[in-house]
Each structure stands twice: as C-alpha cells, then as structure tokens.
C-alpha cells in the first residue's frame, strides 16, 4: 500500500508475500510511472523494504527512504487507518466469500478515493485531479453534471 500524505490518494495491490522485487515493482509501476518520482518514501521495516533491490532503486531514483520506528505502529498510523477502512469496504462487498477479497480491491479503492474526507475538506480524487469523479450513478440518473457535459 502506498499513500500520498497530502491528498490521501491510496495505491494498493494484492500479493501473497511481500518481497523486495514486489516492492520495487510497486514503487515503479504504481508510483513513479503514474504520478512521478516521490521525494521521500516512509515505510515500515518489513523485509520487502530492506532488500538491496529496493535500496538500489531508491538511490537510482534519488528518493529518500525513511523507516518508521520499530514496534511503534503509530508511526504508520495513516497507513493503518486507511488499510482498516479499505478492509471494511471489502468485507461489506464479500460477506462470507473471504477467498475472493482481492477481486474487490479496485472497487474498494474507488470507494475510498471518491469518499469525502472531513480532515481534507475534499475527496482524494478531487485533490489529485482537480474535480470530483463522475460516478456511475450520475450517468445512470442523468445528473445535472452529466447533462451539462452533453
């Protein structure tokens, strides 16, 4: 999971085990190639973040990599909070089909990204794109915003 602390935009992929190769691939594909190279990345001290491959990538990209304090989960409080919200959204989608949670990850991320955040005064989508997302229900019901686009 990657979170932009300013906009609260969340990127997440499902994986059975977090390896250094997975982390490096995530940073390149889900962060750098989509939003540009970050100045700094804060991560936990999991083995996926401590591998030589990730260290080399950070050096090549010029990214400062900071690790959170061990045994102090409050350092990653935002990540833990958002991950909990994503898990709640997924659990409402899957009900008893827990083996299929990864199939609902993108829908859960969409729901989170387009939900109003009181602390920000906007949705993460709005802060990233400069406008609110056009929701499928608005198209279905021909909302004023859809009619104005026509």
Give the ranges of each region predicted by the language model:
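Integrase module of LTR retroelements
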Residues: 1-150
């Amino acid at each position: 999971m990657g979170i932009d602390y300013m906009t609260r935009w969340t990127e997440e992929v499902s994986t059975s085990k977090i390896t250094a190769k997975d982390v490096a691939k995530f940073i390149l594909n889900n962060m750098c190639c989509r939003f540009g190279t970050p100045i700094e990345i804060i991560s936990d001290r999991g083995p996926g973040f401590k591998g030589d491959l990730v260290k080399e990538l950070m050096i090549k990209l010029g990214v400062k990599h900071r690790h959170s304090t061990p045994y102090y989960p409050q350092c990653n409080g935002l990540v833990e909070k958002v991950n909990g919200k994503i898990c709640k959204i997924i659990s409402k989608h899957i009900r008893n089909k827990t083996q299929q949670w990864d199939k609902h990850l993108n829908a859960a991320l969409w729901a989170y990204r387009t939900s109003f955040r009181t602390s920000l005064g906007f949705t993460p989508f709005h802060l990233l794109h400069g406008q609110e997302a056009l929701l499928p229900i608005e198209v279905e019901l021909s909302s004023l915003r859809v009619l104005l686009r026509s």
